[in-house]
A protein has these predicted regions:
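Bacterial N-terminal signal peptides that target proteins for export
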Residues: 2-15, 22-25
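Accessory carbohydrate-binding/adhesion or oligomerization-edge regions at the termini
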Residues: 14, 25-79, 147, 151-157, ...
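Accessory beta-strand-rich segments of carbohydrate-active enzymes
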Residues: 36, 48, 70, 83-189, ...
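Short flexible loop/turn segments that cap and initiate beta-strands
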Residues: 55-57, 222-228
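Structural beta-strand segments of beta-rich domains
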Residues: 103, 205-213
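Active-site region of glycoside hydrolase catalytic domains
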Residues: 188-190, 208-210, 225-227
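Short, solvent-exposed loop/linker segments at the N-terminal edge
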Residues: 196-207
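Acidic, Ser/Thr
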Residues: 216
Length: 241
């Protein structure tokens, strides 16, 4: 094995270049990361509304929905489709022990512009309906009841592509959403890159696995950590780490 030393945010990382072929497991079973399905318990209303991001806003008449969701539901047989804004709201509890950790909302897809509010505060935005994104909501959470509100629009923009042809570009949170809770030192969103540069040259018989991982340190402390990546074969048996 070869070891390469990197420094990122005050953390020393040993990134292992594993000289074995096989599948790569980058998340161990005992990982401190929690992933919570965030698809249930939403409310939705078509249109744009002042103060809909505020926790005290009256959404009692809004439609109760689950995700994934589309602006066109239940009008998918209509010849026309709605272009404009829609709001989503969801209340959820937070325990005290979560507040010292990092919490992210991970969206697999929102068409096509999204503004994410937590307890009335703008936590982040995203443009583009085909790519996932992660929003850090840690600073806006409180113990007890919390409120996330998402303002979405599917208005035409010349700088957001592709949008042409006969396909219907309905708006909405049309893919899954997760609440991901991580320790203060954590692997970033899509923070692991894996390549096998000589696998084709060796015709799949053997190859080196190159791994790069970005680790973020939000603890405010400088320390030394050991980053462990495990290689398993097709049957799930550990081959190296």
């Amino acid at each position: 094995m070869n070891f390469t030393l990197h420094t990122l945010n005050g953390i020393k990382l040993w990134l292992v270049l594993l000289l074995l072929s096989g599948a790569i497991n980058v998340c161990r079973a005992d990982s401190p990361r929690q992933t919570i399905n965030f698809n249930r318990g939403w409310k939705y209303c078509q249109g744009d509304f002042d103060h809909a991001a505020r926790p005290g806003f009256d959404d009692s008449e809004w439609e109760k929905i689950g995700l994934p969701h589309s602006f066109s539901t239940p009008y998918f047989m209509s010849k026309d489709f709605y272009v404009g804004y829609g709001w989503y709201r969801k209340a959820f509890p937070v325990k005290k022990e979560i507040l010292g950790k990092k919490s992210f909302l991970e969206f697999d897809g929102v068409f096509q512009e999204a503004e994410i509010f937590v307890n009335g505060h703008l936590a982040g935005t995203h443009k583009g309906g085909y790519t996932g994104f992660s929003i850090d909501i840690s600073a806006y959470l409180k113990e007890g009841k919390n409120l996330v509100a998402v303002r979405v629009n599917n208005c035409w923009r010349p700088d957001l592509a592709p949008r042409a042809g006969e396909h219907v570009f309905s708006g909405g949170i049309y893919r899954n959403v997760r609440l991901v809770i991580k320790p203060p030192t954590y692997i970033d969103w899509y923070g692991t890159w894996i390549t096998t540069p000589d696998l084709a040259e060796n015709k799949g018989k053997s190859g080196s696995v190159h791994i790069r991982t970005d680790v973020c340190n939000a603890s405010g402390k400088t320390d030394t950590y050991r980053l462990l990546t495990t290689v398993v074969d097709a049957q799930g048996k550990e081959r190296s780490e």
